[in-house]
């Protein structure tokens, strides 16, 4: 399956602006942020809103993310260990998959905060990204959830004991083919959590897929 995270487009910086002057008529333009009146002229200042947003966590080099995870002693646990920690040590499983996947089946008691969500905005940059996904036949393109940390903070304090989970989970363990492991949504989420002050972060090795494969209990949420 083709995967696309972003498309670089030559949009001007948000600091650039066009100044249009008219001696007698008022100019109207979509996207006008502010207008300044100049003696004898009416001046419109149009500020570009199509600038690419700040670099998302997914685009930070995996080596850099992995180093921080190891430095903060983020440890991977298998599904049976995760279940034990959840039952005996008040660990919370944080499922970072899309909401629809979470509702279709998740570990009992797990909470959901999406690491990625459907693209919601309609700026020029977001339209370009939608077109890029559509080029590959993908009509439900996703973006990193800019409210991920705020949403987690609303549910879990910085002292909470968290096991981050996604579908297949990736790994920090080196292999012959992947000497630095392989990143995943849950490892990117774990990186953001420790970067923002969470102190007890674990990672579910094998992900929700392995949880179900091992025959561990799963809850579903039916749509109304």
UniProtKB/Swiss-Prot annotation:
Q: Where in the cell is it found?
A: Plastid, Chloroplast
Transit peptide location on this chain: 1-48
Single GO cellular component term: chloroplast
Using the record's annotation, list all stretches that form the Rhodanese domain: 87-220
Q: Domain of life, per the record? A: Eukaryota
Q: Which Pfam families does the UniProt entry name for this protein? A: Rhodanese
- What are the transmembrane regions? none
InterPro entries in UniProt: Rhodanese-like_dom, Rhodanese-like_dom_sf, Str14
Keyword entries, A-Z: Chloroplast, Plastid, Transit peptide
Instruction: Provide the primary localization.
Output: plastid
The family database entries (Gene3D superfamilies) matched by this protein are listed as: Rhodanese-like domain
Give the active-site positions.
166 (cysteine persulfide intermediate)
Q: What is this protein called?
A: Rhodanese-like domain-containing protein 14, chloroplastic
The scientific name of the source species is: Arabidopsis thaliana
